[in-house]
Amino acid sequence: RKFGLAMTVGCILLGMGAASASAAEPITASADCCTFTAPSYTQAAGETSTFINPVDATTFHNAVANDLGPDKKPLFASGTEPAGGSSPVQGTQYLAPGTYGFYCTIHGSAMDGELVVDSSGTAVPRPSVKLSVLNQKLKAVRNQGKLKVKVTGTTASSGISISASVGSKKLGSVSKVNVAAGASKTVVVKLTSAGKKALKNKKKVSVSVKGSVPFGKPASASRKIH
């Protein structure tokens, strides 16, 4: 009986803990244009907020951060939603505790609000990658029309875009690359016609690669190949 009572009490306490756990307040547009339903919304660090445009809304809305992140794009942003639509506010999971302004890009700064991130959670590490141009023969790159680049995930990263160039001339690019934290993969950048032309009759070149990842810092690398 004592064991059963202890189990019952434990389950009750567990349920209370779950009920009191922090949950991000949805950022919600007002039905009447053009405001949000509250001046501020709260979430724990590490959570991904949600934007909601109510079913009786009269127009499209979104929620986009005022400030830019390390990728030179908004710190966070929802999709632009019709009446009854909703979408995750991507980027909020990386925010440190603090207060962040946002607005609807359709209706301007008159439709704005604040997102308050508290310290009851832990922010997700921002996407981060390292790049390196693999050792390869220039003749093979030129003839095969392919440049091999190694991508290493310092943290889990998705939607990576990589471009390769020689001086001011672009060789080619690849996008939608994903890599897990601590993992590496070889990515093939296919040369464009202009890229192949840039390597024609060259005996040695310095190849530069640049990578961008949503919500993370850009990465770069270079190597001389001959």
Regions found by a protein language model. Give the residues of each.
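Bacterial N-terminal signal peptides
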Residues: 6-16
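Extracytoplasmic copper-binding redox domains, predominantly the cupredoxin/blue-copper superfamily
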Residues: 21-131
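Acidic, Ser/Thr
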Residues: 52-56, 152-154, 192
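Beta-strand-rich extracellular modules
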Residues: 54, 105-109, 192, 210-216
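Short proline/glycine- and polar residue-rich coil/turn motifs
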Residues: 80-86, 177-185
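Exposed aromatic-hydrophobic patches
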Residues: 87-93, 184-193
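Short glycine/proline/serine/threonine-rich loop/turn segments at secondary-structure transition edges
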Residues: 96-100, 195-207
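Extracellular glycosylation-rich, acidic/polar low-complexity regions of adhesion-
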Residues: 125-174, 203-226
